Amino acid sequence: GIKVGVVDLVMFRPFPADLIGRVLQGRKGVVVLERTDQPLAVDLPLMREIRGTVSKCLENGRDAKRAIYPDLATYRELAEAPPLYSGSFGLGSRDLQPEGLIGAVENMLPEGKRKKLFYLSIDFLRDKAVTPKQEAYQQTIEDAYPEVRELAIKGSENPNLMPPGSITVRF
């Protein structure tokens, strides 16, 4: 099995950089999932804070005598800073499915695609267009943005986690 942990951030401000820096230290990979998208930003909001925290922890490791940011962890080597992956989900009110979480983890694995920025539970282009008009629209999009199909990540499976006999109703 794969050893996976979850940090559920319930409050964004003040940002718990002290705790995040310690939790992330030495991890093999960290995926940050955010229910937002900011296409022209360098990073999504939470990833920006986490990247800033990791950077400050690395700065602490530069000076062996004193930490520049005493409340934060000290990363003495670059290897103590985990690779960071940023995922966006829930766009267009789409539900995050188990398949998306599986895909986010599989992306970080050595045999995974290792995309640094990706989207879950959304297809920008359908594999097979429903109508000729949709096919023309999709071709126009793909011509203008050839990499758009690669932005979405899918997991290898989508297990049904509902209890036996239950149904899902969406309003």
Walk through the language-model features, giving the residues of each.
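General small-molecule cofactor/ligand-binding pocket signal
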Residues: G5-V7, Y85
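Short acidic loop-to-helix transition motifs that present clustered carboxylates
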Residues: L9-A17
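A short acidic (Asp/Glu
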Residues: P16-L19, A41-D43
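A short, charged/proline- and glycine-enriched loop
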Residues: M162-V169
